[in-house]
Amino acid sequence: MESRKDMVVFLDGGQLGTLVGKRVSNLSEAVGSPLPEPPEKMVPRGCLSPRAVPPATRERGGGGPEEEPVDGLAGSAAGPGAEPQVAGAAMLGPGPPAPSVDSLSGQGQPSSSDTESDFYEEIEVSCTPDCATGNAEYQHSKGSGSEALVGSPNGGSETPKSNGGSGGGGSQGTLACSASDQMRRYRTAFTREQIARLEKEFYRENYVSRPRRCELAAALNLPETTIKVWFQNRRMKDKRQRLAMTWPHPADPAFYTYMMSHAAAAGGLPYPFPSHLPLPYYSPVGLGAASAASAAASPFSGSLRPLDTFRVLSQPYPRPELLCAFRHPPLYPGPAHGLGASAGGPCSCLACHSGPANGLAPRAAAASDFTCASTSRSDSFLTFAPSVLSKASSVALDQREEVPLTR
């Protein structure tokens, strides 16, 4: 009590530096502990952070008894606010606080850099919720590890454990991210047998029922959903091909009827349009005339009656056979003029050889208008592939007819 009263009296008198040094030295000699640390290190535990300790103190490492005594530091210009704090900390008690402060200062110095590195460690950032959760857990574990490091005297030994646990959480979050990124649906690789069976079924009926889908799924070892999607895509493909075929034809009713007559002659082909069969295009020669004039000049104007046209259009999905224009020798002469037919081979199109066997009325006059001879051909239209038209755009019409069909 006496010493505390004297300290208060001398604090009021202003003779602070020398008395603080004497009292502290007397207390340290009485207790038997080494000299206390400078006032910069005697900071409360709650304030211990990487930025609370000055850089000069960090460079010196853990302080020992060889450092400067408190007398010189207390006499320096530390300010009147820090001196009462030092005196009060020295007068608290001579027992256990001194070893705890020493152990904290001895092990807190190297651990301050660890804490700083923990605070500023980079963390992976991702947009998926799983990764965000993993990063949140990672940060939480990091924060708890740093708190344990500051609060406990043996925080340095607990640092690897906390780092290991947090690293495990981060790796789990990264694995979850990669697993979510790899969950993609790839295209089904159909075999030739599966494609042939599906095409055969589509040729039979365009819309397949669910029991039939189940049978196909069991027979082909495919999921029912895959078969359903395949039929949807196949119907859309067939629709696009039919629209591409019939797009330019309504401008010329006679030519449209002629083309649809070939579509009505479909029968044995598994695919509605073979890949080697190009789409028909108008010739630039016949585009200048009006549709009525071209219909009147066309030899196919009386080839089919309106009833036959409606009969052709009544079929839901026509499968056209090989076009007559690609079988005629005048357009593509030679044995390799296109689709394997010889130069003098017969033509089996409806416009040339449709008779009572095909369900059409006999028409001798119309048949005489158009035969397979090279003398009867029409200049009002020609069917060419786009590649042929692009290559022979500046060639005369007679030379253009001799261009072989490109597969």
Curated annotation (Swiss-Prot):
The protein's matches in PROSITE patterns, at most eight in alphabetical order, are given as: HOMEOBOX_1, HOMEOBOX_2
The residues that make up the annotated DNA-binding region are 183-242
Q: Which SUPFAM superfamilies match?
A: Homeodomain-like
Q: Which residues form the signal peptide?
A: none
DNA-binding as a keyword of this entry, yes or no, is yes
Span list, region Disordered = 29-120, 137-179
Q: Where does it live in the cell?
A: Nucleus
Q: Where is the composition biased (Polar residues)?
A: 102-114
- Protein's UniProt name: Homeobox even-skipped homolog protein 1
